[in-house]
Amino acid sequence: MSECPVRKSNVGGGGTRNHDWWPAQLRLNILRQHTPVSNPLDKDFDYAAAFKSLDYEGLKKDLTKLMTDSQDWWPADFGHYGGLFIRMAWHSAGTYRVTDGRGGGGEGQQRFAPLNSWPDNVSLDKARRLLWPIKQKYGNKISWSDLLLLTGNVALESMGFKTFGFAGGRPDTWEADESVYWGAETTWLGNEDRYSEGQEGHEGHGVVQGDESKKQHTDIHNRDLQSPLASSHMGLIYVNPEGPDGIPDPVASAKDIRVTFGRMAMNDEETVALIAGGHSFGKTHGAGPTHHVGKEPEAAPIEHQGLGWANSFGQGKGPDTITSGLEVTWTPTPTKWGMGYLEYLYKFDWEPTKSPAGANQWVAKNAEPTIPDAYDPNKKKLPTMLTTDIALRMDPAYDKICRDYLANPDKFADAFARAWFKLLHRDMGPRTRWIGPEVPSEILPWEDYIPPVDYQIIDDNDIAALKKEILATGVAPKKLIFVAWSSASSFRGSDKRGGANGARIRLAPQNEWKVNDPSTLREVLAALESVQQKFNDSSSGKKVSLADLIVLGGVAALEQASGLVVPFTPGRNDATQEHTDVHSFTHLEPHADGFRSYGKGTKRVRTEQFLIDRASLLTLSAPELTALIGGLRVLEANYDGSSYGVLTKTPGKLTNDYFVNLLDTNTAWKAADNEGEVFIGYDRKTHDKKWTATRADLIFGAHAELRALAEVYAAVDGEEKFKRDFVAAWHKVMNLDRFDLKQEGRGQNAPKL
């Protein structure tokens, strides 16, 4: 890579930075993202309310009109922008991966680096610019996040396809999301890190040279994609359309497709529906050699105003457009919904060929030119396909699904409509966030459905009585705190899944997760269920959910330990096993969880990095993280009741002892194992053993910024502040999934919610 010009800039922000000196330094930047400071909207701006006031039908009419309003500066293929806008929406939502819930279209991140400059997103800068007059017209009533996806829906409808519906409610973010791991490669289209036998990419725009890759590979049919990634190359959304590493091998391509789409939470039927449905429209672009394509938006000259990939081939647009380097139009009706894609896939035999840009693709054997030219109505072309298209026919499972869809057009249309809706909404979280006139009423199996509360909820008097009942069960307070925290902290701010609402900790698979300490969990749940049954049997009309009681149990124990009033807001309900996709929820199980002193690091990720990642998913700030760790430790909320980090002589009482003892200069720490995961604290003078702790504890004394926070709480005047801050952070985590509540101090435009 070329030398970074910022390092030479002798102004604020320039020069050699800390991370240049110490690349392994633990970075807290992902805990400082998307704060009110970076948000230009008013603090009390309520996006949900603004969206509800939107002239939704007027917006859709404007979008429909845009589809055929071809602009000279960026003309529409076939006189219709539908294919371009479908790709824009797909590539916005399609970055989602179920492994950590990150990516997706829920925050409008396609506007920012690196996504706005990925080689797979060439020309989508033009798509968003075409949308600007409409965004400008409707202002803050429609976010970019919603607009990018709604436009894809309208594009489909404008070409005769009936969609499944649409839900708005995605507030925008205002900066690039630095928390997403997109891979470790340093060149576009490289994959040498995510695969053991991957290849380096290249500087600038281009295509992967499959012929060269083929010489170097031993087996592209058996390889494992690094987790949590869901794309086969740096800068691609899914797989290489030319084939694995540019090699036109449809069978191997099918394997890559199954992995990448699977990590986006799609099964085989949904995968086929999305590919076959999406490729029923538009075309790819590879009119000439890719060396004609200039710098991506983030590297383009300032006068280009955020547009990139200037093209010196011919006119640089229209019939001379170069994006992927592939030149394929799949059907004879690229602006109209129909069965053309599947019909052509099976009508012809296919053979490899090259695009004008030198990319590997396929052409129909013994075929007549039946494919329209995008700009010359008097010209016809031979049918062409991508390696990823031929893969659907060559893979036995995909082939069976394709033939079924081909024989049953209505089934295919329904499957595509549902898969497309899932693609656009998978990272939106529960239905309580879905707003707008086109929200479907059908409960979908992937939406983590929680029934609405249809009974009278408990009041303050009930809450006080129930807290006494819970404490009277004899369950140890530390166990009540552990289970409440375990339930609530399953939440992921990335895709808004998990959390205490629904009480899914009592259901498979969470009830058997090792981190949840199943034996302790069963004991606590049994006690809470008895309290629930007694209350519900004796109250006329009123009910209390187990989800509420799990949180209330933690609140009662915390009040006893702190002497403070801990806020509690009832209104949660209980989910069912029927509405809990076991396979999907397995991805929420943590490998390591520093909050509960569970697990340890790997060769690639240190324990403390897992902790910061987990804090980021919980939308915590660095001070909130610090307060929670200190409190959970002295409250003995560790996995398996371990003493790791319980740096106090009064366990079970909320004090600042954790920080006082961690920062005690009279204590010397030494590793207790060869891995450097567990440490023993010794008295410097007597050499007596005092404490045991893990890396997730010692980092608060070793890391300069975390130590600075710990010092605030360790000071003589820090205990009361610590207790208040812990209770506030606890309350926040208990309610992270309460989208039915307006989050105080954040406004509903807050992207982390």
Curated annotation (Swiss-Prot):
The keyword Metal-binding applies. Heme b binds at H279. The keyword Ribonucleoprotein does not apply. Its cofactor is heme b. Optimum pH is 4.75 for the peroxidase reaction and 6.25 for the catalase reaction. It is an enzyme of class 1 (oxidoreductase). There is a cross-link at Y238-M264 (Tryptophyl-tyrosyl-methioninium (Tyr-Met) (with W-90)). Residues 196-220 are annotated as: Disordered. The record marks R87 as: Transition state stabilizer. Binds 1 heme b (iron(II)-protoporphyrin IX) group per monomer. One of its GO terms (cellular component) is cytosol. It is found in: Cytoplasm. Induction: Induced in late stationary growth phase. There is a cross-link at W90-Y238 (Tryptophyl-tyrosyl-methioninium (Trp-Tyr) (with M-264)). It catalyses: H2O2 + AH2 = A + 2 H2O; 2 H2O2 = O2 + 2 H2O. The active site is at H91 (proton acceptor). Formation of the three residue Trp-Tyr-Met cross-link is important for the catalase, but not the peroxidase activity of the enzyme. Inhibited by KCN. Belongs to the peroxidase family. Peroxidase/catalase subfamily. This is Catalase-peroxidase. The lineage of its organism: Eukaryota, Fungi, Dikarya, Ascomycota, Pezizomycotina. The gene is katG.
